């Protein structure tokens, strides 16, 4: 596994953004994962949509080939370390959970939120929208 998709990247894929779809088609699904927090955010967005049933089906289809990574003990330890390192200029809690999973698993986080995530020590970030 190489890449962990942030929620914003998943949303762009669900909205059929060409640059994201091209990158996803160019890599093996075995190399791409989402954190359980991202999965939760996607499900919440589906429930909030104008067409919850259709949105839930789209989310399920999108997630089907991808590994879902839990917030495990290693991620919890990285979370504490990163939260301490960022205490003077913290990032959002959900973003910190996602970043912690990426760091714990040694994965590159694919996000459009480069400004926020670039401050996270030991986290490699890529943007696939170009």
Go through each PLM region and give its residues.
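Alpha-helix capping/helix-boundary segments
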Residues: 9-10, 75, 97-98, 115-116
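Short, well-structured N-terminal submotif of metal-dependent ribonuclease cores
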Residues: 1-34, 44-61
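Histidine- and aromatic-rich ligand-binding microenvironments
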Residues: 6, 35, 91-92, 113
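Acidic, PIN/NYN-like endoribonuclease modules and their adjacent C-terminal/linker elements
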Residues: 1, 99, 103-130
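Generic structural signal for small/hydrophobic residues in well-ordered secondary structure
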Residues: 6-7, 20, 42, 79, ...
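Active-site neighborhoods of divalent-metal-dependent phosphate/nucleic-acid chemistry enzymes
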Residues: 65-110
